[in-house]
Amino acid sequence: MKRSTVLGSLWMVVVVSVLGHQPVMDMAPRWAGGYGVQLFQVHSIADDLRHGESMLPNPQGLESRVDTTWLEGVYTFRREFRITAKVPYVDKSRQWLRDGEIIRQTGHGLGDIIIGAPIKKYVNKKGYTYNLSLTPNLRLPTGSTDDDWAVGDGSWDAGLSLSYSFETPKWYHLYDLYYWKNGSGRNFDHGDELAFDANIGWHAWHDGDNGRGLFLMLDIAARHIEPGKNQMVDPAGDTIAVGPVAMYYHEDWMLKFEYRQVVYDKAETMRFGDHRRFAVGFGLTF
């Protein structure tokens, strides 16, 4: 089988923005010695205030913006085992109230690098294939804590993911459950996180002769974050976000666009809500 044809089917797996802690390319390439890189730009904004399930008045126009550029990579030792890495650069700002006064906080620089080691079990059947994956992760304290709104918290964090994916020539499903245990930071702590992601994809178009095609997906992301310590704005609470994903691939490269909107939000304390997330990514496999 031509390598371009193989890549055409692999991009069905690459498309998913799964496991908020792993590269979108964590499952490809599948051949021993293969590797891939991706540049992923994420823009998140929020301008509503929440407490519990209620939206609060925001007469001061408080708002939050986070822009993160991810350099993501994967190396496949053998089909069942690979190493992944995510290196973020963060630029963010927010307005908040302190003692009744509006303050502006900013932060920028290298964020916390994430290393993962997916272990996979593939099963091929007539007309479909599926795989199970167990992925330990380590988040390194590489992000600075010096800015007004720190890009890191100085802690070593451990994560574990269990996922299941299923694909046919026309459909792709992925379900992922993961947990982050956050360590003690410098002066403040982030709360632990439990999350579930579901990706449902449709292979809308495929040109096998030229190794190109288009995927359309629905992305669903549910999060539960425990309260942290000494944070001016604690993200603790429960959220569910949904949105579309579109990805075009051509042989060894792919271009991806996604949008995600929070549809359910329950905040432990007053914080920003109604988050909107826009992202674009470009990836290559070798």
Placement of each model-derived feature along the sequence:
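Surface-exposed strand-loop-strand hairpins of Gram-negative outer-membrane beta-barrel proteins
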Residues: 43-68, 148-149
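Residues on the lipid-exposed face of transmembrane beta-strands in outer-membrane beta-barrel proteins
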Residues: 39, 71-75, 85, 115-121, ...
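Outer-membrane beta-barrel biogenesis signature
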Residues: 17-54, 125
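Transmembrane beta-barrel strands of outer-membrane/channel proteins
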Residues: 37-43, 85-89, 134-140, 175-179, ...
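Outer-membrane pore/translocation modules
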Residues: 91-191, 249
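Short loop/turn motifs that connect adjacent beta-strands in outer-membrane beta-barrel proteins
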Residues: 25-33, 80, 123-131, 169-170, ...
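Residues that define the transmembrane beta-barrel architecture of outer-membrane proteins
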Residues: 33, 65-69, 108-113, 130, ...
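Outer membrane beta-barrel transmembrane domains
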Residues: 50-52, 59, 190, 194-286
